[in-house]
Amino acid sequence: MGSACIKVTKYFLFLFNLIFFILGAVILGFGVWILADKSSFISVLQTSSSSLRMGAYVFIGVGAVTMLMGFLGCIGAVNEVRCLLGLYFAFLLLILIAQVTAGALFYFNMGKLKQEMGGIVTELIRDYNSSREDSLQDAWDYVQAQVKCCGWVSFYNWTDNAELMNRPEVTYPCSCEVKGEEDNSLSVRKGFCEAPGNRTQSGNHPEDWPVYQEGCMEKVQAWLQENLGIILGVGVGVAIIELLGMVLSICLCRHVHSEDYSKVPKY
C-alpha cells in the first residue's frame, strides 16, 4: 500500500512539473513578445519606458528559471533523489516569494505606470514628424488605426504638434481618419493627410478634421486590463502548480529514507 502511494505521488509530481515546465515557457515567451513586438502599443511603451523593458527581462528570467526547476523536479521525482527534492522545494519557495513580491510592487505602481504612459504618448504626438521614418511613430499610427481613436485624452492632443498646426489647409493625422464599417483594410496610413474639398478654406482647425474624436487613453487602458487579466491568470496558475509541487515534493521526500545516488541518471 505504501509503495503504491509513493508511486502515485511520484508520477503526480512528475505531471505537475511537466505542466510547470510548460507554464515557464509561456512566461518566457511573454517576455520575449514584449521586447520583440513592433506593431502595437507595447512597442510604444517598451521603446520609451525602462520599467517595461526591465519587466520583460524579469519575465524572461523567471520563465527560464521556472523551466529549469520543472526539469529538475521531473528528474528528482522519477529517480526519488532526496537532495534534489529538497533543493527543488527550496527553489520553489524562493520563486513563489519572488512572484508575490513582484506582483505587489506592480500593483502598487500602477498609478505611476499610467502617468508615465500618458507622458510618453503626449511627447510622441508633440514631436511627431511626418517626413521621418520612425518605428515608434509607426507603432502609434497602428494603435490609432486599429483601436479607432485619436490622441491620448482626445484628438485635441494633436494641436500640440507644430508641424501639423502650421499647415495652411485642413490637415489631420492619417491614422485617425474615420473609416466606415465596411472598410476592413489592415493597412495603416502614416503621416498627415489633407482633407479633400478644403482648398479654399484658410487655416487648419481641429473641428474640421474627419477623425475619431475619442482619445486612446481609455481604450488602451482597457486593452492593458484585458492582457493583465491573462497575466494574472497565468501567475495564479503557476502559483497553484508551485504549491502543489511543494506539497508533493515534501510527501515524496518523507518516504525516501535513504540517499541512493545510483538512481541519478548518468549523461
Swiss-Prot record:
Palmitoylated. Palmitoylation contributes to oligomerization and surface expression. Lymphoid specific. It is a multi-pass membrane protein. The keyword Transcription does not apply. SUPFAM superfamilies: Tetraspanin. Gene3D superfamilies: Tetraspanin. Glycans are attached at N129, N157, N198. A lipid is attached at C5, C74 (S-palmitoyl cysteine). GO terms for cellular component: extracellular exosome; phagocytic vesicle; plasma membrane. This is CD82 antigen. It comes from Homo sapiens (Human). The gene is CD82.
